[in-house]
UniProtKB/Swiss-Prot annotation:
It comes from the Eukaryota. SUPFAM superfamilies: Crustacean CHH/MIH/GIH neurohormone (SSF81778). This is Alpha-latrotoxin associated low molecular weight protein 2. Pfam families: Crust_neurohorm. Co-purifies with latroinsectotoxin. Residues 1-19 form the signal peptide. Disulfide bonds join 36-72, 52-68, 55-81. It comes from Steatoda grossa (False black widow). It is found in: Secreted. One of its GO terms (molecular function) is neuropeptide hormone activity.
Amino acid sequence: MFKLICIVFIATILSITSAADNEDELTIEDFLSYECNESMDIEELKEKDKVCSRCANLHKTQSVIERCRLNCFTSEYFKNCEDNLQAKEEEPEEETL
């Protein structure tokens, strides 16, 4: 049983690490799939994509990420995500007793 738990733990860590490594590897296909033209550079695309990813994590749903990326990050969803993330950052931290 212990071996099984260890294997599952290691597999989880590897998948998390792999996903983090791939996060910064955006390609020309990403530009096309997000309906972006060449006027946006890859760094700007990465930053906007991070906003959508963080927003999806905040709302605990993947459907947000697709809507956020619509029309090269110009949708109302993207604006709402930016606003929600900014509001979340401005919330006072809860004190732990």
